Amino acid sequence: MTHDQIMLVQGATTTSNSMVHEDAQARESAHANNHADNRSGYDVILVGAGIAGSALATSLARAGRRVLVLERDMSEPDRIVGELLQPGGVRALQLLGLEDALDGIDAVPAEGYDIFLSPREHVKIQYPHMAELPTRYGRSEPLGPDMHYAGRSFHHGRFIMALRSRMQAQPNVSVVEAAVTSLVHDLRDRRVVGVRTATSDVYHAPVTIVADGIFSKFRKEYGGAYKPEIRSHFVGIELPPDSVLTPKHGHVILNQKAAKRVAPGKSVGPALVYQIGSDATRLLVDVPGPVLPSV
């Protein structure tokens, strides 16, 4: 990694060594360098222990790096996102040696989608078999013994805790439950040299990776000029496990009549249905608009 770049990868921000900041921030760095609680001895500091942070911390530790992970809340999250992992995501876990994170969390195989325009108009789309990939899609997937290209759906929180468990099992990973409030910059060349927490603890490492999710507090400062535009919100509820029409499939339910009634340039999003375990099925409804309506 060069020292003059910022890299955004699926919500993770990697900060390196040539950030130009105001003198006030440089003065803060000088103060931090003399802080009584300074901590060092790490190769990488990782802010956030979600899917990206936990998986990356485990991989870096297995490669011999000394990793410090700072996460504001290590309890099991209760969220309605990140519940259906596509086949490519399953293969990525295999590449990282983390496919066993899908074991023991009551995950449901996902073999494709059933898309509905009306109760009588629907089409089933199956994920391809491995042998079909070269001829149909121009590539192959050599990973794993299973010849079926399948995803998994699950409770998001259970998957997060499984990834965290594997991360914490690495002897060279240290986990601190703390909120990171700022990045620390060197006074001389203003590179990022660590982080400061809400309790004023300061930790140092040559590389700092911020993976604190879609609502990252550091995105405005380090993410460039791009600002995500919110077009809609998902509203979710849990249904009984037998609510799915086609087992082991995600369901996309379109509303043709509603789509005809909306104003030009706007559209009504779909409803998504998929089983997330032997105990529940998830229903997500896309609500258009930048602000979620009050209930």
For the regions a language model picked out, list residue spans one by one.
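Glycine-rich FAD pyrophosphate-binding loop
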Residues: 47, 61-81
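Conserved N-terminal helical subregion
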Residues: 40-41, 91, 100-102, 109-221, ...
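N-terminal Rossmann-fold NAD(P) dinucleotide-binding loop
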Residues: 53-54
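Conserved N-terminal glycine-rich FAD pyrophosphate-binding loop of Rossmann-like flavoproteins
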Residues: 74-94
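Beta1/beta-strand and adjacent pyrophosphate-binding region of the FAD-binding site
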Residues: 37-50
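Intrinsically disordered, low-complexity repeat/linker tracts enriched for polar/charged residues
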Residues: 3, 21, 25-27, 31, ...
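Conserved FAD-binding catalytic core of PHBH/FMO-like flavoproteins
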Residues: 212-295
